[in-house]
A protein has these predicted regions:
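Sequence-structural signature of mature extracellular/luminal beta-sheet repeat domains
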Residues: 1-306
């Protein structure tokens, strides 16, 4: 597979995990110190807009102009771009605090589809959940009246979320299972689910619907045979492996890769990049033929043109 090069844009913080394109072409990202940044379309000017007080991950636009933040520690937040005011929209589900709010997609009617990755581990122990394969992730929806409903449970590291262009389905990445699950919202299959993609070559992270109508998926790391062997083992082995110190756990292989699928699950784009200066793609956003990428571990975002 050909390896392409990315244009890397530094930000004043580490772990710019997701990327968002604003209505005027500005690029939004957020880092592990809680900062939410807005970049000019050319990436030359970076402005800190707000601080969440937690660990922001997925970013989306709300219909009222605010920026939705999936904060792994605090839940669903809304940021007013002009003032930087932060409002907590949802921090609990069924009376219990969310442990690992991760990614979201916003419907035209204001519903917010989002993931809670694990009932056992937080963002700070994400590798433990992946290794143990707790299968406690959920796909949730926040209705406009503020109520929250569980659409899917038992997901293996629930991660990225994307809506169909016609909002007939919502897709969710199961990082541990290397699949993209499609939950039907309308039509004769409403309420059921199937797969948009299976047996991916790596572990899917954040997803988004591009301006090209495709579902873009960040592939954080290639398939790891050691991780797969541990996950296939008995519960005691998985739990013991999850309790190993971070330095002793399997580490993501250094790579930078994104894929794009049509509504039939066909691969339209599969791009791998030189990972020397930017690796571990965890967020991806296409707009007008340019694709921006975020990373859980890099002090930067990056882009390429299709």
């Amino acid at each position: 597979m050909a390896t392409d090069r990315l244009t890397v844009v530094r930000v004043p913080g580490n772990g710019a995990e997701d990327v968002l394109i604003g209505p005027k072409g500005h690029i939004w990202t957020a880092t592990d110190d809680g900062s939410v940044f807005r970049l000019t379309p050319d990436g030359h000017l970076v402005e800190r807009v707000a601080t969440t007080g937690g660990r922001p991950l997925g970013l989306e636009l709300l219909g009222d102009g605010r920026v939705l933040v999936c904060d792994a520690d605090r839940g669903l937040l809304a940021i007013e771009p002009r003032s930087g005011t932060v409002e907590v929209l949802t921090s609990h589900v069924d009376g219990t605090p969310m442990r690992f709010c991760n990614n979201a997609a916003v419907a035209h009617d204001g519903r917010i589809f989002f993931t809670d990755t694990s009932a056992h581990y937080s963002i700070h122990e994400w590798k433990s959940d992946l290794i143990e394969a707790t299968r406690t992730g959920r796909l949730l929806v926040r209705h406009t009246d503020g109520s929250v409903q569980t659409l899917l449970s038992g997901l293996e590291f629930a991660n990225g979320v994307a809506l169909a262009a016609d909002e007939s389905y919502v897709a969710v990445a199961e990082t541990g299972a290397r699949t993209v699950v499609r939950h039907w919202l309308t039509g004769r299959h409403a309420g059921s689910h199937d797969f948009l993609a299976e047996d991916l070559p790596g572990y899917p992270d954040n997803m988004s619907r591009g301006s090209d109508g495709l579902v873009w998926v960040a592939i954080a790391s290639p398939r790891d045979p050691l991780v797969e062997r541990i996950k296939a083992g008995p519960g005691p082995l998985r739990r013991a492996s999850a309790k190993l110190p971070a330095w002793a756990q399997p580490k993501p292989k250094r790579t930078a890769r994104v894929m794009a699928f049509d509504d039939d699950g066909e691969v339209v784009h599969d791009r791998t990049f030189d990972a020397t200066h930017f690796h571990m793609a965890t967020g991806v956003r296409e707009h007008g033929g340019r694709v921006w990428i975020g990373s859980l571990v890099e002090p930067a975002v990056a882009w390429f043109d299709i």
